[in-house]
């Protein structure tokens, strides 16, 4: 179990946890800035009137992005966007957020269960596995967009992760970076640790129990 000392007045003082649930981009890998470049280009091409859309869609599945923003006349462009996205992801740099490998290894040594809960699909994950063959050894469960019907900020993905691990929601702590992801963890009734890899500490603080820059020096 994790036992968090008091780091924020909103947290339970000495609550123990049995599982840690991690988002992928901006939480495990420092990749959100790369996606901002890709989706910024696509949004300016097709939806120039929606300023900053590339930031608002973070945490959403590709299906949800298409349904909400690329429908009607833009539906015919989905195939081309998808092809460009997969080509982009195949060339992406997947660098771990500083301290992540040591942190999650420590959790597992303590007997905690760990799960990846990402809006990315299985094809994206195949690119991750090719670049990081060790990746699957970090997690007891990996949930992708194919495993849940509602995307973040819905709590559905985290409900399913807790169920997969045979744990109660309150036994889990969530690590997230995007506004949609943070809201998802909060709506699931879980303790939420926010990483300021994508948004500022000040902006994400209202949605978190703890805010950290990365995993370096984050002791349990």
Predicted feature locations:
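Conserved phosphate-coupling serine/threonine residues in phosphotransfer and NTP-handling enzymes
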Residues: 27, 118-120
């Amino acid at each position: 179990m994790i036992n968090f000392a008091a780091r924020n007045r909103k947290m339970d003082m000495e609550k123990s946890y049995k599982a840690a649930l991690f988002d992928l981009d901006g939480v495990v890998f420092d990749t959100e800035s790369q996606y901002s470049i890709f989706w910024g280009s696509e949004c300016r091409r097709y939806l120039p009137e929606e300023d900053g859309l590339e930031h608002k869609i973070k945490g959403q599945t590709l299906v949800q992005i298409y349904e909400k923003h690329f429908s009607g006349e833009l539906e015919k462009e989905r195939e081309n966007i998808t092809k460009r996205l997969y080509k982009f992801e195949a060339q992406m740099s997947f660098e771990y957020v500083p301290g992540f490998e040591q942190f999650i290894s420590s959790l597992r040594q303590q007997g905690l269960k760990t799960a990846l809960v990402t809006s990315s699909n299985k094809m994206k994950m195949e690119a991750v596995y090719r670049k990081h063959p060790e990746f699957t050894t970090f997690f007891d469960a990996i949930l992708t967009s194919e495993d849940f019907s509602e995307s973040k900020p819905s709590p559905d993905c985290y409900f399913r992760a807790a169920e997969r691990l045979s744990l109660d929601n309150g036994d889990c702590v969530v690590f997230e970076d995007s506004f949609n992801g943070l809201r998802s963890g909060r709506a699931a009734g879980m303790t939420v640790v926010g990483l300021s890899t994508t948004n500022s500490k000040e902006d994400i603080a209202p949605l978190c129990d703890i805010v950290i820059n990365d995993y370096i020096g984050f002791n349990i």
